[in-house]
Amino acid sequence: MLERDGPQQWPLPEGASTGAVRLYTDGVFPTDDGRARFSAADYRPVAEPRDAQYPFALTTGRLRDQWHGMSRTGTLGRLFGHVAEPVVELNPLDVERLGLQDGALVQVSSRRGRVVLPLQASDTVAPAQAWIPMHWGEEVLGGTDAQGQPLHGVNGVTLPVVCPTSKQPELKHAAVRIEPAALPWRMLGLAWLPQEQALRTREALRALMPAFGYALVLPFGREPHADGLVGLLWRAAAPAPADEALVRQVEALLGLAGGDALVYRDRRRGQYRAVRLQTQGADRLLRGVLLAGDTQAESWIRTLLQDERPAQAYGRALLAGGATPPVAVAARGKQICTCFNVTEPDIVQTLARCSGGADARLAQLQGALKCGTNCGSCLPVLRGLVRTSMSAAAVTSPAATMPS
């Protein structure tokens, strides 16, 4: 049935053709007499309330496309298209009060451990609260703090206390403090690698994490890749430039140590850049990048590599520092639908040609791009974009529309 008709609503009793939209509408419950049982539970406060030393309430939760510790989902680059990297989310008022900016590295500390993450302002988080997805464990995050102690994934910060009845751990709340992480030297590595090499490289990079004040390694891309390649992202930060030998070790792991790599080194300033291109037909594609020290070029060179754009026009300008690209690069935009690799700009452009009510516009969008027609996880985002497009259409002149 799943192969023929797609996802089904649970529960689906044997012999039924469709799942039950709502349980217990007949008033019969799975007990001996068919009547519901209610448990009068006394209110219990959180095990670790906020205080002056730990003024933020950290909550954790799941991401749309990931599952628990990512032992399976964490191996698929396509599932990182929706949320590519770990962050800690704070209310914008708290970000301003702390004197921080989006993207700044911060240390989130509890009475049990510490984790370093980039900061992201979010209106969905209440003041005095912080949110970190529960999936970001030591498989992807690492580093060593200023006292030489290992950094942890998010569960190294959360609380091990369990509910006396269910024995479930209280992982959804912990008191934490958040402060800037003094790690000004940065490193970014990106590479397309054969699958087996990517697995070995990921483990080798994980072994290097303790040498930095912050490090992560994650896959990216879309399976199956036309050439059987897997994308790998490496990011690290430190209070001072890393030893050149360590930088060269990362270069070699990312396939940037051969004679086909373009390399720039400024040892005195701790600045290193390396790129590797591969000929494919009439084009030269970027297959590996390392930026160390000045990583501002990430804003455009990452798009070139991940979207596999022709890069031959850039030449040695690929080694240029700074956030301004030598040739304009248009990013594909945020991925919304993982199943069909549909991005937000694709959706916005298509909705500009749609007409009718919200349901009609959603149906036209799905017919044109197929987004939201498989697993359905992106439907809430799609409906939000439909509403936004309708609001925009109400205050602008009408555009060419698609038939209802």
Which role fits each region the language model picked out?
Residues 1, 73-89, 93-256:
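Long, contiguous, secondary-structure-rich segments that constitute the structural scaffold
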Residues 1-75:
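Long, low-complexity segments enriched in small/aliphatic residues
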Residues 333-346, 367-384:
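Local cysteine-cluster metal-coordination motifs and their immediate loop/turn environment
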Residues 390-404:
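Intrinsic disorder at enzyme termini
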Residues 323-334, 355-374:
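Immediate flanking context of iron-sulfur cluster ligation sites
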